[in-house]
Amino acid sequence: MEEAELVKGRLQAITDKRKIQEEISQKRLKIEEEKLKHQHLKKKALREKWLLDGIGSGKEHEEMRKQNQQDQHQTQVLEQSILRLEKEIQDLEKAELQISANEEAILKKLKSIEKTTEDIIRSVKVEKEENPEESIEDIYANIPDLPSSYIPSRLRKERNEGPDDEQNRKALYAMEIKVEKDLKTGESVVLSSIPLPSDDFKSTGIKVYEDRQKSVYAVSSNQNTTYNGTDGLAPVEVEDLLRQASERNSKSPTEYHEPVYANPFCRPVTPQRERVISPGPNFQERIMMKTNGLGNHANESAHNMTDGLSERRSNGPTHTSPTRPTPQPRSMVQQVEEMVHTQQKRMASPWEESSNRQNEHEVSPRMELSPSRASPGKSGPQCSSPTCQEETEDVRYNIVHSLPSDVDDTEPVTMIFMGYQQADDNEEEKKLLTGYDGVIHAELVVIDDEAEDNEGQTERPSYHPVAPYNQVYQPPKPTPLPRKRAEVRPYENTNHKSPHKNSISLKEQEERLGSPARHSPLDVPVAGDGTEDPSLTALRIRMAKLGKKVI
């Protein structure tokens, strides 16, 4: 009771102290307001007094004098109110100090009487020891809404505990692991792991490990538990065995293969019969234009494709030419073709043809040389069979096989110039590329540049460095007509003396470019005045304007 009274007195002291503090704060705010009013009235009285000195006697003077007296009286009242409030604040502060002193005294008494946490725990233990007959059931019996079937967890645990508790615990999960131990190295390898129902598991064998979470029993293969060489397992060994068993169970039966890269030139795999195209000059005569850069590129592609197709068409064994190692893309797969001695037509799928074309285009011209054209310095098997001789036929017929099989030979072909490629002009290359002249003939050559479309609309005379040909008049660029051109016979001179473009002699052009002319049996016949084809001359002039060098 004394402790409760002390606590009550302390709470009352705290409440009174709080009220006094609030009252003190209110009085201080009121004092501030009174001081502001007092200052204002004092200034007003001084101003009115100064005005009275300058005004003579009269009614107005009397009114101002009365107002000044009222202001002075109000100022005195405010001064007295301020002094009174300050005195009250001092009294309240003294009362607050007194209450604080009483609160401290009550707190000291309360600390001397109040029990600590340790004392409370100690007293509870003493009470429990004094009343041992009181059980948990008596405590829960006082709860009104508790069902009669409820049994506290502590009481259930006490009832379930017994002398053989460690042996009577039921296994939640069991697994049979067959382990093979190497007696030389001491390593254990898990051969198989079979999960077992926990109900069917019986603690048979010798216990070799137990950590209150899992138990390991060693059983021999013949179910004999008394055998020699059984020792306890270390925790590391048990964890290793469990890890191997779990890895063995979690292995996926999925078989993985090497990465497969898609072929960007793949077509539907519907088999089609290969069209047999007899090599001849019919189609080439229609698409030949003499330009070293474009002819070189087109002839290289045609030569590469012809070698691959001639190997497929040949009846003899396949010959591999000596090549220099060059980096190939990862997606390119080396293909080994096996030729079969047969006279029947071979069926080929379109995707195989496109894949072969891709490989043939990406290989450099030096790698596509046949053994019969290889230089003497390079080592490799020499080929003198008729099959190899067929491969070394005139390259002007090979471009036919590089085109798709669905292209009609009678329709014109549009060839777009994509640019030049730097190439070393050495004599060894010329010898290896015997039979290549870099010439393509065409019925109609249209050279167009979007940047100079406006310039081609106006007619202007062009200047030629050679005096006899400097008065050639250049009309507007001809527009190709959508009509079929007449067939041109082989080696027919297609040069017609017409003032379409400037003409320049071959000798002078070669002197300007600084490279000797390549004479070939397929050169375009030169006109009687020593000039070459106007279309070729226009192409050379156009390339010179663009800053490109015609090789």
Swiss-Prot record:
Comp. bias (Polar residues): 341-353
Cell compartment(s), UniProt: Cytoplasm; Cell projection, Dendrite; Cell projection, Dendritic spine
InterPro entries xref list: Paralemmin
Keyword Acetylation: yes
Tissue specificity annotation: Ubiquitous. Expressed at highest levels in the heart and lung.
Record cross-link Glycyl lysine isopeptide (Lys-Gly) (interchain with G-Cter in SUMO2), residues: K125, K178
Gene giving rise to this polypeptide: Palmd
Record's keyword terms, sorted: Acetylation, Cell projection, Coiled coil, Cytoplasm, Isopeptide bond, Phosphoprotein, Synapse, Ubl conjugation
Name of the protein described by the UniProt record: Palmdelphin
Top-level division of the source organism's lineage: Eukaryota
GO BP term (any one): regulation of cell shape
Coiled-coil zones: 12-106
Quaternary structure annotation from Swiss-Prot or TrEMBL: Interacts with GLUL.
Modification N-acetylmethionine, positions: M1
Database matches in Pfam families: Paralemmin
Basic and acidic residues bias spans: 247-258, 354-365
Modified residues (Phosphoserine): S135, S321, S349, S370, S375, S384, S385, S498, S515, S520
Gene Ontology terms: cellular component: cytoplasm; dendritic spine; membrane
Region span, Disordered: 247-266, 294-390, 451-533
Annotated positions of the Phosphothreonine modification: T270
Cross-link (Glycyl lysine isopeptide (Lys-Gly) (interchain with G-Cter in SUMO1)): K178
Organism: Mus musculus (Mouse)
Modifications after synthesis and translation: Phosphorylated.
Cysteine-cysteine disulfides: none
Family note: Belongs to the paralemmin family.
